[in-house]
């Protein structure tokens, strides 16, 4: 465990922020740097079949150390960090034996406060790794990477009985592209776990059904003084569209299993406006209903426009709820829950109000629920992780490998 923190700090020092709207995968050069570093480390550890694809998927195998027909299982994390917040020059702060109260983030006015983040009350006495208030931390998902790498080392050093353990590190998870180029056949695992969750005990096998909605609005601009009956203001049409979207079904108004509509961006002029929404819902029927709602709104607002002015709406599904695939293999969840209990952790099954590579992989034939990392407040400057939580994640990964080896 002594190298766990060292690994984590090493990984977060590399800027691996992914970039949306880029065709190439990985979308940024920084991701390649971390992938090559990990490849080198896996080879130094003696893993076999270490491969790095042209699309930036790194795979390796820790061979079984016991005989018998033991299922090969996998552990997966992603190397990129969110485009939502800078990941350049990350300067972690280590707060040992947290005693409560606000934590100053760097030398500015930013603080990590239990008033805003009450979970801090549960972490007294622990070692917290925070940002300096200028960047994100990168625990999502470099904590997961450090935990998998450390678990591999523990399995080797302590000679713990295990079957074949596959590991994979993927790019561009944060922009929804990482799993699209994942070779499930080459990975050759019966099932896997992404290590990409939050607080200790979290075990997730349900995620949103997700879609993106892009709306193009073409208006007509003339001088405002002579605009009557001629001007069609694309921005006004955009405002009317958003006014029709249920205001109480937005991210800031929903929780748990509730879905939402989220206006992620809006820009434009009188002549042309563009809106980008994301739609999320756990229930497939409600998900489809939300997409129909957006089409109905666009049709309603666009009714009666001059032929040269129009509203164009494109909906694209991003990923689906993996629950339907994972529940077909209940032992995957049973093993994870037993592993947690064996490590004195009470499993907390909760829905992911987001998505992971595991969601897409589950529909590609690799059932893949999500394990905790010990991190909190992802995608922003208040992100932090606890060293104790990371250590617990390592213990759970090791125990899952051990329990799977007993399923002969």
Curated annotation (Swiss-Prot):
Matches recorded under Pfam families: M20_dimer, Peptidase_M20
Keyword Metal-binding: yes
Positions contributing to Zn(2+) 1 binding: 78, 140, 196
GO molecular function terms listed in the Swiss-Prot or TrEMBL record: metallopeptidase activity; tripeptide aminopeptidase activity; zinc ion binding
Catalytic residues (UniProt): 80, 173
InterPro entries: ArgE/DapE_CS (IPR001261), Bact_exopeptidase_dim_dom (IPR036264), Peptidase_M20 (IPR002933), Peptidase_M20_dimer (IPR011650), Peptidase_M20B (IPR010161)
Ribonucleoprotein among keywords: no
SUPFAM superfamilies: Bacterial exopeptidase dimerisation domain, Zn-dependent exopeptidases
Binding site for Zn(2+) 2: 140, 174, 379
Disulfide bonds: none
Compartment(s) where it occurs, according to its Swiss-Prot or TrEMBL record: Cytoplasm
Cofactor: Zn(2+)
Catalytic activity: Release of the N-terminal residue from a tripeptide
GO cellular-component term (any): cytosol
Family classification: Belongs to the peptidase M20B family.
Function: Cleaves the N-terminal amino acid of tripeptides.
Protein name: Peptidase T
Organism, scientific name: Escherichia coli O1:K1 / APEC
Phylogenetic lineage: Bacteria, Pseudomonadati, Pseudomonadota, Gammaproteobacteria, Enterobacterales
